[in-house]
């Protein structure tokens, strides 16, 4: 039985139309599925299964975190992993706001014999921050009003790390020697005006290394703080005879001002723990008044003979910091996580230790936008592991304390980008 050419053509056309319809339907289905997946992946990055410690928001439990466009988009007990373009599994790890190191020295430069002001002893931040979980540093007075513009151009604006600073009351900054003893270069009015001009970066004022038996530098730095509405940080001591520590803490400093190197025992300064191993009563009184006691470990400013009895009597630091520079990084200090680990082993609760390097320093420098992971906050995040084992910790007198816990940085995120990843938590396997 023959089929007419016309009928054959109609059948062929009908078949082609059917195939085309099926093809279009398949394409539409694929597009719909792709669109659904894309819509489902509403977050740039998810961190799941981690134990979040966020002091500002009083969180100390397992939580998932979503990041979008460099900011915290959601913090919930459970977020569907399918909603993230990239997912980091933080099972067994501690997730924290990016650490804030409130005492560093980052005015690295090439001027000789200028100590920490545009010289070799200071360190450029990025090589020493992210690998220890730090996303924000606060330089403790390396620049003064005369060289803050240089510092801004060559350090602040060249760093991925957020760099803030205390402005030295000495116009030439922390240049060492006679330059830091020059009362004529300690101008509170000019310092306050410059701090206001550079308000995006300057968070307070610093006095350090003055060795005269004279309250004038202290009075001038506090005046600068009052004029600008900012705190001051004091590296106190060095005078002969000693200026009384009690007068500094109870009369000279204001609530919110910062006493750094809290656990030091150095010449020219009364230590906070007396000869009988007791914390001096006025030290507790000062902390209750609102004086901020900062660790500022450094290369010569933290000894166990002060820290251990003080911690045993409940005298905890308000902020934990490093005093990072070339003279401290290879000694007992090492990095901020090593310093924090010392306090964990001295029985300071982990939640308090994390707060002392995140939300508390953020408050002290009047930067309430930092140090927490609230929705809408910048996505600066640190993921650490609390290792168990046998460890040794060294002070600046080269004495050792044994411990069984130690913090290690696993991953650091700055403004939503992974900037340090020790074990490839954010990476896929090479053959996948």
Language model region names:
Residues 22-35:
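Bacterial N-terminal signal peptides
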Residues 36-40:
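Sec/Tat signal peptide C-region and signal peptidase I cleavage site
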Residues 42-46, 52-98:
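Histidine-rich, glycine-flanked metal-binding segment
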Residues 50, 378-430:
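C-terminal cap of metal-dependent C-N hydrolases
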Residues 85, 90-157:
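Metal-associated gating/positioning segment near the N- to mid-region
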Residues 124-152, 159-177, 198-213, 229-233, ...:
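Divalent metal-dependent hydrolysis catalytic cores, especially in the metallo-beta-lactamase
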Residues 150, 185-293, 301-318:
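Histidine/acidic residue-rich metal-binding segments in metalloenzymes
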Residues 305-388:
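His/Asp/Glu-enriched, well-ordered alpha-helical/loop segment
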């Amino acid at each position: 039985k023959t089929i007419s050419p016309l009928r054959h053509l109609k059948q062929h056309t009908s078949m082609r139309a059917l195939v085309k319809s099926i093809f279009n339907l398949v394409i539409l289905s694929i597009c719909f599925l792709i669109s659904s997946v894309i819509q489902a992946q509403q977050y740039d990055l998810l961190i799941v299964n981690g134990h979040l410690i966020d002091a500002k928001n009083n969180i100390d439990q397992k939580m998932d975190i979503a990041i979008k466009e460099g900011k915290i988009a959601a913090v919930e007990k459970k977020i569907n992993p399918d909603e993230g373009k990239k997912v980091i599994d933080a099972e067994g790890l501690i997730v924290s706001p990016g650490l804030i190191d409130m005492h560093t020295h980052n005015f690295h430069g090439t001027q000789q014999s200028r100590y920490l002001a545009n010289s070799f002893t200071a360190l450029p931040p990025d090589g020493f921050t992210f690998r220890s979980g730090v996303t924000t540093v606060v330089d403790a007075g390396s620049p003064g009003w005369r060289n803050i513009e240089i510092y801004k151009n060559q350090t602040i604006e060249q760093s991925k790390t957020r760099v803030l600073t205390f402005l030295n009351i000495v116009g030439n900054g922390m240049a060492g020697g006679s330059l830091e003893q020059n009362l004529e270069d300690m101008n509170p009015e000019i310092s306050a005006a410059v701090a206001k001009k550079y308000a995006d970066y300057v968070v307070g004022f610093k006095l350090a290394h003055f060795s005269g038996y004279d309250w004038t530098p202290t009075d001038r730095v506090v005046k600068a703080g009052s004029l600008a509405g900012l705190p001051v940080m004091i590296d106190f001591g060095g005078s002969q005879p000693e200026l009384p520590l009690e007068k500094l803490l109870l009369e000279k400093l204001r609530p919110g001002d910062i006493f750094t190197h809290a656990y030091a025992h150095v010449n020219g300064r009364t230590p906070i723990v007396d000869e009988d191993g007791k914390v001096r009563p006025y030290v507790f009184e000062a902390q209750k008044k609102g004086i901020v006691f900062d660790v500022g470990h450094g290369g010569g400013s933290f000894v166990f003979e002060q820290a251990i009895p003080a911690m045993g009597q409940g005298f905890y630091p308000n902020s934990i910091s490093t005093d990072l520079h070339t003279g401290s990084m290879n000694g007992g200090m090492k990095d901020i996580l090593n310093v924090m680990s010392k306090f964990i082993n001295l029985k300071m609760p982990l939640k308090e230790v994390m707060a002392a390097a995140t939300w508390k320093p953020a408050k002290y420098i009047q930067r309430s936008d930092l140090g927490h992971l609230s929705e809408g906050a910048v996505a600066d995040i640190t993921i650490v592991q609390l290792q168990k084992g046998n460890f040794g910790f060294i002070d600046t007198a080269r004495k050792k304390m044994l411990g069984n816990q130690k913090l290690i940085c696993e991953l650091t995120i700055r403004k939503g980008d992974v900037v340090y990843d020790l074990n490839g938590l954010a990476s896929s396997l090479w053959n996948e």
